[in-house]
Design a protein with these regions (language model features):
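Short histidine-centered catalytic/ligand-binding loop motif
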Residues: 91-94, 261-273
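Conserved catalytic cores of phosphodiester-cleaving nucleases, focusing on short active-site segments
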Residues: 238-265, 282
């Protein structure tokens, strides 16, 4: 990926081509799983975007549209039975520190320092409150000091202390006050913020990224571009992390399982997490977007027309001459999320065999999805069809049972 003049269009401060997004807000049938078929009945509180290229769509609205995104397509490729099981019996997704870290680096690199400060709050550290009462033992000791009974629970001890001592710092109250003041924000520890700022700084030092970044944030091109389209009667969507006139930037965080070089760990993460399939889904979406662009289906575009003109010119070149400097490239920016937050930047030609196979797999998943929906419907289990196997020595490596 090389920088070139005009790789990032200046914002023009006006409603772009197409005006406001065209969408229908309806209501979803309670308890019904996702159904991305165009023919699916619409009822109750469903957000459905019309086919088009959209700028500035809030993340929550994008995810509310039930079109199949890259994650769903990847799940359908790997195991459609498992996909439908997750739709019918969804578990409660916990927001782990790994997820928070990934969301935070996305926010910092794609939206900027101010957005990170607005959406994320830094948790107070107990080391900043050296005189605070933290444990039950601390509370009991202070109760003894002021001459009150602590009770059996923390809440009882705190209430007893507050009857006689209004000034002593109590850690539980500090945390409760902090959480009440930061409702709606994601809470991360101070160490995580330090790592994220370091990651953003190191990203910008990369010679391929430096020309399109400022203050640790992408400033050329457009972040979080949403594409909605229809294929084979199935509604599909994609949300590109960052789009340059000559490259698709996909930002990922990864955590190595073992101590190894960041470069090798990043490659393993791409393979293990099947990010190739996500890339295949995005490439399909961008090809569909070229047709939507030709039809004028672009909404809330704050950029000069030349920006998307250049994107789709580069895409057309990539289809015929992927090695050309003028061809659109795929760029993974992999950020190590444990230890030193090193960036690994990997550029891929869109014509690579890996991507061609990924696009073919996505094509197959769309066909399979429609067939399974027509056979079983959205509200029923999709029955497994694994034929009985005959296994032998060649089904395992010679070292499998050592």
């Amino acid at each position: 990926m090389t920088s070139r003049p005009g790789s990032g269009m200046a914002r023009v401060g006006r409603q772009g081509m197409g005006g406001c997004p065209l969408r229908q807000d309806h209501h979803h049938v309670e308890g019904s799983p996702m159904n991305a078929l165009v023919s699916a009945p619409i009822s109750n509180n469903v957000v459905r975007f019309e086919p088009g290229i959209y700028f500035g769509v809030p993340e929550a609205e994008y995810h509310a549209d039930q079109s199949l995104g890259s994650t769903s397509l990847k799940e359908l490729i790997i195991d459609p039975v498992e996909y439908q099981h997750d739709q019918l019996y969804p578990g409660v997704e916990k927001e782990t520190m790994a997820l928070k870290w990934g969301h935070a680096i996305h926010c910092r690199a794609l939206e900027g320092r101010l957005s990170l400060a607005e959406r994320f709050a830094i948790a107070p550290a107990v080391t900043d409150y050296k005189d605070a009462l933290v444990t039950m033992e601390h509370l009991r000791s202070h109760c003894k000091l002021v001459g009150v009974k602590p009770g059996k629970k923390k809440e009882e001890a705190i209430a007893a202390i507050r009857e006689f001592d209004k000034d002593v710092l109590i850690w539980d109250e500090i945390i409760a006050k902090f959480e009440a003041e930061n409702v709606g924000r994601t809470i991360i520890p101070r160490d995580a913020l330090h790592e994220i700022e370091m990651a953003a700084r190191w990203m910008q030092r990369d010679p391929k990224l430096a020309p399109v970044m400022r203050d640790g944030t992408f400033v050329a091109g457009a972040s979080e571009v949403s594409i909605f389209y229809v294929e084979n009667g199935v509604r599909l969507k994609a949300r590109i992390d960052h789009l340059l006139s000559h490259a698709i930037i996909d930002l990922k965080s990864f955590r190595p399982f073992f101590k190894e070089r960041a470069l090798e760990a990043a490659k393993k993460a791409v393979s293990r997490m099947r990010y190739d399939l996500q890339a295949g889904a995005y490439i399909k979406a961008l090809r569909a977007a070229a047709k939507l662009y030709a039809e004028g289906r672009v909404f809330n575009n704050p950029y000069d027309r030349e920006f998307l003109d250049s994107v789709f010119r580069a895409l057309a070149v990539a289809e015929t001459d992927a090695d050309s400097d003028d061809a659109l490239k795929w760029v993974w920016v992999m950020i190590k999320a444990s230890g030193a937050p090193q960036p690994v930047v990997g550029e891929f030609d869109l014509s690579s065999m890996i991507f061609k196979q990924a696009v073919a797999d996505v094509d197959g998943a769309i066909v399979a999805y429609r067939g399974l929906m027509e056979k079983y419907g959205p509200d029923n289990e999709w029955e497994p069809d694994i034929p009985a196997q005959k296994w032998g020595d060649t089904d395992w490596s010679p070292y499998a049972f050592i």
